[in-house]
A protein has these predicted regions:
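Tandem repeat scaffolds
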Residues: 2, 8-11, 29-302
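Bacterial N-terminal signal peptides
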Residues: 12-26
Length: 303
């Protein structure tokens, strides 16, 4: 009985104080909200940085610049417009996540899985994504200029209107992509697999395509001015509407009877000539091993 009375007295003293605190909090609502957002951003970074999970998390607009996510799981998360500049997303799983309009300039994406993710209008300029998986990802109008994508898997990705100028795509898989209107100007595409892709109206001027595989790909109105095609496999490729191609360039490549070229150009058969294969792309650095999985983050907003 004494304990109940004691608690009652404690409440009678505390409730007015709580009411006063609530009133002050209401007056300072804008400042409190700003601080709260900052704390939540730090919490997400701290709690997921080492092998945690945040599946289906709502992180749109969050400031996660410089964050480190190693071996983390963010499947189907929403990061629309998030600030991820300089972030380290190493060996993590972001399959099905939405990075539309996110700023990922200079981010490290080595060995991460972005299968089916959306990067529409995202800024991925100068990112390091060696060995990353972008299979079936939507990178429409994304800025990937200067990005390091050696050995990345972009099979079936949508690159419509994307900017990959100056990107390093050595040994990258670009098979079956839709890259209409994309820019690969000055990009390194040596030993890349571009088979079956749609590169209509793409800009490949001054690109390096040595040892690349362009078989069965289409290049209507694509620009090849000063592009290098040494040992390039163009068997079955449709280059009939390509611009800027010269006989000197085509003579360095090889094709077959199904290769379609602009009028007046001819190609030697790959046949017995044999293709000199480019060396395999360097293996991406192995991501550090993640610690034991943590529980899903309770503090992050979810759908």
């Amino acid at each position: 009985m004494k304990q109940i009375v004691f608690i009652s007295r404690r409440l009678s003293v505390a409730l007015p104080a709580l009411a006063l605190f609530a009133g002050l909090s209401a007056l300072a609502a804008p400042a409190t909200a700003e601080v709260s957002l900052s704390i939540q951003d730090r919490d997400v970074t701290r709690m997921i940085s080492l092998g945690g999970s945040c599946n289906r998390c709502e992180l749109s607009g969050r400031n996660l610049a410089g964050a480190t996510f190693t071996g983390a799981t963010f499947t189907s998360a929403t990061l629309v417009g998030a600030d991820l500049r300089g972030a380290e997303l190493v060996g993590s799983n972001f399959s099905g996540s939405d990075f539309s309009r996110a700023n990922m300039a200079g981010a490290e994406l080595v060995g991460s899985n972005f299968t089916g993710a959306a990067f529409r209008d995202a800024n991925i300029n100068g990112a390091e994504a060696q060995g990353a998986v972008f299979s079936r990802a939507d990178l429409s109008r994304a800025n990937l200029s200067g990005a390091e994508l050696m050995g990345a898997n972009m099979n079936g990705a949508v690159l419509t209107g994307a900017n990959l100028s100056g990107a390093e795509l050595f040994g990258t898989t670009l098979a079956n992509v839709s890259a209409r209107g994309a820019s690969f100007a000055n990009a390194e595409l040596n030993a890349a697999n571009m088979a079956g892709g749609d590169f209509g109206a793409a800009n490949l001027s001054s690109a390096q395509l040595d040892g690349a595989r362009l078989s069965q790909a289409s290049f209507g109105r694509a620009v090849f001015t000063d592009a290098s095609l040494r040992r390039t496999d163009i068997r079955g490729a449709d280059l009939s509407g390509a611009r800027g191609l010269t006989q000197t360039q085509i003579s360095q490549a090889c094709g077959d009877s199904s290769t379609r070229l602009p009028r007046g150009l001819s190609v030697r058969s790959c046949g017995s000539r044999g293709m000199v294969r480019m060396p395999s792309p360097p293996a991406p650095p192995a991501p550090p091993a993640a610690p034991s999985p943590r529980r899903d983050i309770a503090s992050a907003d979810r759908h």
